[in-house]
Amino acid sequence: MVEDEEINDQISEEEEEKKKNNDSDEEMKDIDEEEEEEEEEEEEEEEEEKEEEEEEEEEETPKKPMPPPQSKAKPSSQPPDIKKASQQSQTQKNTPPPIQTSQSSQSSQSSQSSQQQQPKNISQTQQPKNTPPLQSSQTSQTSQKTPVSSNNGIEKRLMITKMVMENFKSYAGAQEVGPFHKCFSSVVGPNGSGKSNVIDAMLFVFGYRAKQIRLNKISELIHNSENHKNLTNGRVSVHFQEIIDLPGEDNYEVVKGSEFVVTRTAQKTGNNKDGVSKYYLNDKVVKLDDLKTILKDKGIDLDNNRFLILQGEVEQIAMMKPKGVHPGEEGLLEYLEDIIGSKKYLPDIEATSKLIEDIGDKRTSSNNRMKVVEKEKDALQQERDNALEYIDKELKLIHCKSIHYQIGRSKPEREKNEIAAKQEMVEKQLEQELVTQKASNDKLLEFEKNLKQQNKQLDELNKQMAKCKNELLTTEKKGVKYKEETKHLKTKVKKNNSVIEEETKKQAEFERSTIIHKQDIVRFEKEYVELPKELIVEEKKLESMLNSLKGEVTELQREMEEKQKQLLPWSKKHSEAKAVVDLKTSELAVLSKDFNGATQNLDDAIKALEDAKTISSTRKNNITKSKKELESVKAIIVDLEKRLASGKVTEENLYRNTMDAKRQLEQIKTNLSENSSRNTILDRLLKIKESGQISGIHGRLGDLGAIDQKYDVAISTAAFSQMDNIIVETTAAAEACVELLRKENLGRATFMILENLEYQRQNLGPVQTPNNTPRLFDLIKMKDEKKYATAFFTAVGHTLVADTLDEATKIAYGAKRHRVVTLDGSLIDTSGAMSGGGLKPRVGAMNSKLKGDPKEDKKKLIELQDNLSQLDSDLRQCRDELVEIENQIQQAQNRRSELELELPKMDMDIKAAITKCEELTKVIPQLKNKAKLSTEKKEQIDSIKESLIVDQKSLDKVQEKVNKLESEVQEIQNSILNVGGPQLKMQKNKVESLQSRIDSNQTNTTKANVQIKSLAKSMEKSIKILNENTKEKDENEAALAEILEKYKSLEKENLKATEAMEAVSEQLREKEEETKEIRKEHEKAKKVIEKIKVSNSKLETQIEEFKTLINEKQAEIADCLSKFANQAKKAKIYKDYVDESLINQVSAILTPEEIEQYMEATEQQNLIAKIHELTTQIQKISKENNVNIEVVKDFQKKEQEYHSRKAEFDEIEKERDNLSKRYESLRKNRLDEFMAGFTIITMKLKEIYQMITLGGDAELEIIDREDPFQEGISFSVRPPKKSWKNISNLSGGEKTLSSLALVFALHHYKPNALYVMDEIDAALDFKNVSIIANYIKERTKNAQFIIISLRNYMFELADRLVGIYKTDNCTKSVTINPNSFTSLSTTTTTTNNSQQQQQQKQQQKQQQQNSTSQK
């Protein structure tokens, strides 16, 4: 009720209507309450049955957990109605959610509930019992479109399954609307949510412009909201399918393969601010016209879209005028006639009416012209009779002359036949030669084809060779790189091995020396222990010996002891000084060795670094130069290749020009040969003219004019022999020339006498030709047009020139026959005979410029010979240059390959040098550090040297003192020894020897310990060097192994590339040999063809000579025939004045037998005498009477014009009668067809209006009963309990009902598969809304209705509810199957009733308690 009141406020109805609506609402409430009570009982029974079925299903399938109830504080994103339904559904544990239920699950429920949900007021309407359902409308109307039927007779129809909107208007993203029901779907939702955008989306898909959808530009249709800004495209897709209805509300069968999708897109572009749009059918782009045609075949007419009723349009249907006032305006008459189909006759009726008016005017005009011509004809009768007598004499003279000229052609005709027989023999020989030439040409073409194919294959092989070379070059570059890396690594490994070997030897030597020194120390220590003992023994012996000589040597011993006491401290000092000097000498030797090695290594590294930098710099300079040279070589190759390609084109052009020059030369030679005899006669006659013997000779006809080179073949074909005619002024001059030729036996010639050709001057004026085709005569440029025009016209006549044979055929075989020649030499005569198409067309009959020198052809021949010689020379020179260029290209390519190989090598050298520099740069600081340490050692060495010098000086001083004391002791000892004899000396030597050995052992032990320490340090250094080199060697060997593995793989690739290149090279060599052989054969074939051409040229020359002779004989015959033809032409002058059979008789061609009759001299004399007699009579008649033969022609014209006018008048009369009959027939067919459909629609309108208004009446009435199409159709209705009213006087709701009744009646007459309506119930009260909804529900099963409505009485009866709601300024959709809520509503009602009963009981108890307390 709230929604009804809001709608009534919006449409602003009158207060009385509002009261009626409120009363009717209350009545509907009562009816609804009664219906609910009955339905509750039925639903309880159904609920019990459903619960049993659900329990059985639950045993088979697990129960789905229901979602928890929503909190009241949390706002719902669903529209209000949907939210209520979802809350109710949560109260039923075993009821599945109803949103978007499948059609298959609803089929059984919808069929059971469809009858139970029908309101009672619908069953109580005044509907006739025998009214057939809407889908059983008459199909006998020929103009009615019925649903498409399948092969077995079952009707199928189109339906919309769903719509998908993406970024369209209020729909953001891809939003699916549907699925729609096959019959009745309703779109519901609050105002502003985007319901009407559903219809706007359909209008958009069906081709409506943006302004028709309430916007200005296509780009404005794209969605734009706060959360979805700057979208660039939108689209709408409508999904269709064809179905076959099955029993049950939801049951149908989809026609296999009938599904299709229609899509339209809108897109913003940078260049087009308005946006662009495209149409798609099944994702394929289509044009709108094609889409309209496809949908029209499916039953959707987008041009006359009666299936779309927009918001506010429903009232406009009934408000249409009876008839459109202005052209293109649609009234009710046009609306109905468009649906009935009788509108198809209207264009023919209007066109026929216009034709009848026009032909009436033509009839009156034709009758007047016929009467005028009849009067003019009668006035010329007498003059016509006088002219016919003159014409009779003239025709008899023509007849005699015709016989005379036919007799004169007999002799040359026989001679011509003999020459023709010889010509035929030569032509047969030429034909055989041509066959041979054709075979040779075919063979040459085959060679050329093979040569072209070979060249193509050679190019392909050359490409393969270049590819192989590039691959090989790549592998070679890699190989050079790997070789350099291998070489570098091997050098490093070799160096490592050398160092390792050296250090290993050093370590072995160190170990051996250490062992020896240790052994020496052990031996020295052992001797050091044993020798003193032995010394004591020997000293005791010596002492004993001395004691025995004590008396003799006492003084000497005392002196010696004194000296030895002096010597003892000095000996100790000497030993100490000597030990210090020896130790410092050993340390000095070790330190000097390390210092010299470090310095030498640093110097070597610095020198190697300088060398590496020098190599890198040198290689960089070389690589820069090589790269520049490589780029230069590549540029040279490109330039040479361009020159080679250009040279080949030049060579081909020169070869073609050479061949063309040769052909032109042969042609001119042939022409000169053909014209030799002709030029001889002409030269002789011109000399006679110059000498003054014969006057009036003008020359050869072809030399007296010129024609564009384009028309040379045409003029030569059409009038070759005529162009050789010699033009003379008078008959006397012609006879003199003939006599000269006979005397000098120069041959034959044909002469044209200008004074006898004056009659042709009347034909020189311009004439109208088909398609303005030029006359050959008009294309000739003459030396003196006034003088020679008649001669040229006699030669070519009205011959026309066409570009092609097809054009010539159309002109020649038209309504009037024409003589036509084509540019390529085909000729069609007026008789229909066609000639042409030979090997070579005729040329040279006339020059392109006016001829001044008769020797022009010879000069041209010399020019062509010189040109040909120059071309041959240029061709040879060009070929030599091409060979030279190819050699240069090969040299440049070789140099390029060398440079491409050198560059990687130099690059590797640079990389190796850079690597070495980097290594040395790292090593040198280390060596410098070592050298720095050595410098410290050097200072230590210097210090040791200085100290050693001091110590050595001290040692020398001590040594000097010791030596002196030892010398003195030695002298004393010698003295003692001399006293003691040899034994004492020996013992003394023995003691000294032992003492010396003891001293030596002490010194050697010190040296050995110093050497062992030095060797230990050297061993540590050697081990470190050995470890470093061993590690470096392992790394280098691993890198070397990897490089070698890569190199092996590269060698395989290189081998493959080499083998591939060798294979391609072999193929290339073989292909070049094949090409060489084919070229040889090609040249041979060319030479054979040239020989054949020379032979053919001779035969053609011979044939042309025969033709020339034949032409001469033909010229004689033609002269006679020309004179005979002239007589025929003269006779044809009178063809417009006398009967045509008489003209044919006087110019008839005689048979050979008839000619033989006139061959006798007597017959010829009689014929000549008769000619003179008739000539005299004609001259006499001309002088005596002023005869005007044109009167005969004028009379004939008037007579013909009279008959023509009479026939024209009769034809117009007949045509007028036929048009009148057709006009009446078309009007009758239109009226009959319209009235048949109109009657059905009117009856159905009355029936439907009575039903939906419960007693009202409606009628479509023809305003003019005589002619329904004159004033149109009026629509009158009588609402229930009211009088008849015009539509304009009805209320909004009554207008809506009237329009809907008319729409339903039209649907009955011509069903549409689809109807889309936007708020058609806006102006209706709830009662009428319910009636309309029930009508759509029950009576339109054969169509799909999609209705946008806010009225619950409408959408509650829908088979499918499509909810539209908006959140965040974005429209969304949800689809509900109402039938799935049947059980839900029953359970809810039962629960509510039990709750109410409990509440009533509690209230009663409370009242009883209150009453008790009061008491």
From Swiss-Prot:
Protein name, entry field: Structural maintenance of chromosomes protein 4
Coiled coil: 361-479, 533-675, 855-1120, 1162-1233
Entry's family note: Belongs to the SMC family. SMC4 subfamily.
Summary of the function given for this chain in its UniProt record: Central component of the condensin complex, a complex required for conversion of interphase chromatin into mitotic-like condense chromosomes. The condensin complex probably introduces positive supercoils into relaxed DNA in the presence of type I topoisomerases and converts nicked DNA into positive knotted forms in the presence of type II topoisomerases.
InterPro entries in alphabetical order: P-loop_NTPase, RecF/RecN/SMC_N, SMC_hinge, SMC_hinge_sf
Notes on the domains: The SMC hinge domain, which separates the large intramolecular coiled coil regions, allows the heterodimerization with smc2 forming a V-shaped heterodimer.
Gene that this polypeptide is encoded by: smc4
Signal peptide location: none
